[in-house]
Curated annotation (Swiss-Prot):
It comes from Chromohalobacter salexigens (strain ATCC BAA-138 / DSM 3043 / CIP 106854 / NCIMB 13768 / 1H11). GO terms for biological process: tRNA N1-guanine methylation. The gene is trmD. NCBIfam families: PRK00026.1, trmD. Homodimer. The keyword Plastid does not apply. Its main location: cytoplasm. S-adenosyl-L-methionine binds at G119, I139, G140, D141, Y142, V143, L144. It is found in: Cytoplasm. It comes from the Bacteria. GO terms for molecular function: tRNA (guanine(37)-N1)-methyltransferase activity. This is tRNA (guanine-N(1)-)-methyltransferase. Specifically methylates guanosine-37 in various tRNAs. Its EC number is 2.1.1.228. One of its GO terms (cellular component) is cytosol.
């Protein structure tokens, strides 16, 4: 997959192009990431990349005269690579955008070319959004200093779904949210830590039972911690049965806990 990034601080992206899963993907040629810095399109001696907003007020906006050429050049590069326009998308990281979730990540990973625009200052001219941006995306309802970190989140999430990037073919399928659910608990050696033991089922070697346990824990953890993810979700018969079992086990555990709290101390 090819990803183009428009950013005033391309050096920040070395965190994902040189390290970890995405760094290995770049080294192996599975993922290619190129950069366009609007500052390279400045014509004045100060290489100005910001401008005052009409109407006054605090803050500055990214300069149109340097931002648009960077986006246009990234689009042309995608075309030169033979990427179909219908499978090329320019996205802008913005608080006004669609919330990024795993379904959205899958949509973006199906593209041939993804161009990510990382904003700075107070944002970009609305006319640039209308003319040059295909979609706006957000990673959450909070304020950051710029779009580079959200862009890195998007690039990392998308690259994980590129065939061959993850070492194990099922890793992406088993990630949290891959099926709209939280992940199940995981355990490694040793079998006992401070008196806490690995669940017996995981030591049984019964792969069918382990799969069932993991699905139950995934459903239950979602019900406990992110119940909104289950709203409107149609569970199949097995999923509903496992969730009901988990809820019943939780109720039993809580009742036992309350009984223990009320038990008088022995004299």
């Amino acid at each position: 997959m090819w990803i183009g990034v428009v950013s005033l601080f391309p050096e920040m992206f070395e965190a994902i192009t040189r390290y970890g899963v995405t760094g290995r993907a770049v080294d192996q040629g599975l993922l290619e990431v190129d950069f366009w810095n609007p500052r390279d399109y400045a014509t004045d001696k100060h290489r100005t990349v910001d401008d005052r907003p009409y109407g006054g007020g605090p803050g500055m906006l990214m300069k149109v005269a340097t931002l648009r050429p960077a986006i246009a050049e990234a689009r042309r590069d995608a075309e030169r690579r033979g990427c179909a326009p219908a499978r090329t998308r320019v996205v802008y990281l913005s608080p006004q955008g669609r919330r990024l979730d795993q379904r959205g990540v899958r949509e973006l990973a199906d593209l041939e070319a993804l161009i990510v625009v990382a904003g700075r200052y107070e944002g970009i001219d609305e006319r640039v959004v209308e003319a040059d941006i295909d979609e706006e995306w957000s990673i959450g309802d909070y304020v950051l200093s710029g779009g580079e970190l959200p862009a890195m989140v998007m690039v990392d999430a998308v690259s994980r779904l590129v065939p061959g990037v993850l070492g194990h073919g099922d890793s992406a399928l088993e990630d949290s949210f891959s099926e709209g659910l939280l992940d199940c608990p995981h355990y490694t050696r040793p079998e006992t830590i401070d008196g806490r033991q690995v669940p017996d089922i995981l030591l049984s070697g019964n792969h069918a039972a382990i799969r069932r346990w993991r699905l139950k824990q995934s459903l239950g953890r979602t019900w406990l911690r992110r119940p909104e993810l289950l709203e409107g979700r149609a569970l199949d018969r097995e999923q509903q049965r496992l969730l009901d079992e988990f809820i019943a086990e939780q109720a039993t555990s809580q009742n036992v806990g309350r009984t223990e709290e009320r038990r008088p101390l022995e004299e």
